[in-house]
Amino acid sequence: LLAEANMWPEDVREYFGDGDECHMAYHFPLMPRMYMAIAQEDRYPIVEIMQQTPDIPAGCQWAIFLRNHDELTLEMVTSRERDYMYSMYASDLRARINLGIRRRLAPLMDNDMDKIKLMNGMLLSMPGSPIIYYGDEIGMGDNVFIGDRNGVRTPMQWSPDRNAGFSRADPQRLYLQPIMDPMYGFEAVNVERQSRTSSSLLNWTRRMLAVRATSHAFGRGRRTFLKPGNRKVLAYLTEYESDTILCVFNLSRAAQAVELDLSAFRTRVPVEMAGRTPFPPIGEWPYLLTLPPYAFYWFRLAQDVSAPAWHQEDVTLQERPTLVLFDGWNSFFREQVMPWRIGMAERMREQLETDTLPRFLEIQRWYAAKGTSVRRA
């Protein structure tokens, strides 16, 4: 049983009862604050509303979403915040309706794939069950020239065929026509086309859903929001049983660096979940990450994974092996030096072969046998 109540989280809490009434309830106040955070490049709107969200009975869930079949409601924000959202996302008055914005996700993000993926990355990792509005997985657009809220309810764009593959009926008999503009039209944006492209938004969404399914921590875990000094970065931990997930999001249009206090997880190795790439282990110092514009990471803080092979605990520069020659290259050859320097030449060659060259080889990037000692070269 799903409750649709556009109210503050503490008021919606009553609909769950003791776990014997509604199983799920929409978290309406979170939706506009996710858009506000990316517009302001500040995590505060998201963190504030999540701190106001009460615990709910075990077995119940919040339903979280980026868009739905109605307007992006702005009832749960202040009048000042509402004016800001209108100026950022609905400068065209035709996009406004009631106390909200009748646009889809892709147009709201200016069809910027990095921003769309960032929003979906937050959606899929926030506490609760994510709900994806049909068409958002392929970046469908809308039609602000259609009255009421029907501009975001156009037919699903399955293929470039007639009626976007949605219906074989006469196009004139459709209740709503499919989108036909050059950027979002069904000939350019459709499931059939994106299914054949590995880098498409559709296939990216499928991969991220598959990654999410590998850990129960996403849906059932307890969230702890971190408070790094850089407010352009949103970071939180999700813990469930022995599984710990770290989610980090860059809300800015510029690259950002962030230092995270992860000392409670010292010696664990963060493994980036999409590519299964191990990062350097967590130490006693703040953990430094850099993120490209509108980028995010999901890390599993693993206890049973080794640090990457290239990682060195001692990052100080090693002293370069040095050998001072008394007679240029002739110093290595006893046949080419004065008789009274033959002993010096032999010692010089011995030092070259057993010390200088082995140490030089071991620090070269192209040397494949890392971790093994070279006795003589």
PLM feature segments, named:
Residues L1-Q312:
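Active-site and adjacent substrate-binding regions of carbohydrate-active enzymes
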Residues Q312-A377:
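Conserved NTP-binding catalytic cores of kinases and kinase-like/nucleotidyltransferase enzymes
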